[in-house]
Amino acid sequence: MSCRVYPLLGLLLASALSPVLAAPATDPTSLLRDVRQAYGGAQWNHALALQADGKETGDDLSGPWQMLVDLRSGQFVSRMRNDVFSAAEGTDEQGRWREDITGLVHPLDSDEAHTVGVTENWLRRFGFLDAHSPVSYRALPDVQEKGHTWQRIEATPAGGRSVTLWIDPATHRLDRATWPSSFLVVTQHYGDYRDVNGLQLPFRIETSSANLAGNSDGSSVDVVEHYKVLDAAPTTELRRPDGKVRDVTMANGARTATTRLRVEGGIVLVDVSIDGRPPMPFILDTGGHAILTSDAAKLLGFETKGNGVSGGSGSGTMSTSYTKVHDTALGDAHVHDLTYTVLPYPFGFYERGDGEPIAGILGLEMFERFAITFDYDRDELRLSPYDQGEAPAAVKGDAVALRFTDDMPLVTAQQDGHAGTFGIDTGNAGYVLTFPQWAGSNGISSRYAAGLPIPTGGVGGLFIAHVAHAQQLVLGQQRLDNVVAMLTREDAGATGNPSEAGNIGQDILSRFNVHFDYRRQQMVLMPRATTPEWHYGMVGFRAEKEQDHADRFDVINVMPGSPAQLAGLKQGDAIVAANGKPAAKLSFGTLRDMSAHLPEGTPLSLKLADGRVLEMRARDMAPR
């Protein structure tokens, strides 16, 4: 495990320990001996598996929960359901897997998923009670937290991630465990220990995660009603669900469905009909899930349940709730009874001037049900269903293998001669993202850190990043030398992920026609009818609309030395027209198309609310 994790953990833990007083470290061998005795000692020799049944509460929703664990291998399955959705996850002989809240399964098979999975499986099977488990221990100084002393051990299972165990010296039982997982830090608290057949087992397990800025990314509480100690390891019960699609129908006997696709300011929009209503624009995002904006959910008359949080690009989070949609249709493809998350996106996210507002996002659940082709030449999206007779045919082209740490597909690509794991994110409307931890470890961060400062962000809020021309990007067999990359920040949430190299979005993907086939775990890049020219000229500002004055864009950032600044544009100015088109009729995306990714010298005229008219010409400002 890289030593860089320790200061990150320290940042998070420091805020929780008030005050913190370090004491000499306790010898781990003697401490673990006491722990093993406190948990039941030799009684564990006769336990081969555990089954826990109870209730899970999360996002203000509750329902039955069950977990089955093989205490020797660490294989497990955990299932929950509530009034809105069900979900499951596990490890079987094939590896880690997850069943999402829409009922379909995908593997968690990246290097990061494997590393984290080894440690989580070790914890789940109480691996610290196994004196023969292949794990290294390191004593950490005792700490005091709110008047209570905790003994701590850092444990690193073979092939796994280091985890800090917090032990109560009065009971010699585990109070909590903390470990990094992707861009989050996970904390699991154990309490309400009781005797079960001579074993001391926790009847309350609280799991929470936070990003590196310390903002919550969700939590759940599992309350065990009863345990079963099994003297035989389960096999069939631990296997993942078959993953067969049972909730899709194709109208008119269609084998393939087609719907309109367009790209607006780098944002991929597709037409989607909800419960038979006229089609509305949705973002199709491999890094996303089925989401309705709060405004769309209200307009469509959906009731919501639950109250959670969601993170993303940036360090902040957003509140969430849930609803069920009877029919989601993309052309002739219909998905029935799909669970949607409802998010209170701001007006500037969904407003499209004189166009229909963006109603939401579709993501993982579509790619699990269909092989999907983004045909940018024809401005259409094609969907071929799984498990409807003959499987979708393989597509010819440059096939790139996909893997998963979470729900976004990952590929191996190269930037500036260095290989790394990159997210494939059709919802990324901007530049290639380069994550600072990976860039630093490969010696290329200074090149980008000296680049143009530029505002960016998403669900987690805005932050300043830096852009520069990359030397080269290699994706599959494609070598691209006209690419601008953006160096993000370590505290940028999912876009500052220490386990990945970066994120590839529309700036690269739309240079090809792209086919996704999750059953084959591949993305296929196919040549466009005409090779598109790519430009990085910009005028250098960012502006957003507010609902109470939708007839103008408020300028929130002007880049130093940019054509916009030289023309006299300032933060706080209000744009009422661009190239003669009223701002009321323009979306964020269309204004972006008029002000960025342009050939150098492209003119832009901005009329401001104070009567000024500013003339400027696009310039490629990213250093080479």
Describe each region flagged by the PLM.
Residues M1-R4:
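N-terminal secretory signal peptides that target proteins for export/translocation
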Residues P7-P19:
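Bacterial N-terminal signal peptides
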Residues A23-R33, G95-V163, P169-T171, P180-S181, ...:
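Flexible, processing/modification-adjacent segments and terminal tails
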Residues S30-L104:
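N-terminal mature ectodomain segment of secretory-pathway/periplasmic proteins
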Residues H46-D53, R72-S78, K146-E154, H172-R176, ...:
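Short, hydrophobic/aromatic-rich segments at coil-to-beta transitions
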Residues E56, L140-V143, Y193:
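Short, solvent-exposed loop/turn elements at beta->coil junctions and helix N-caps
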Residues E56, M80-N82, D100-G103, A155-A158, ...:
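Beta-turn initiation residues at beta-strand->coil junctions
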Residues D59, Q66-D70, G117, A158, ...:
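Pepsin/retropepsin-fold aspartyl endopeptidases
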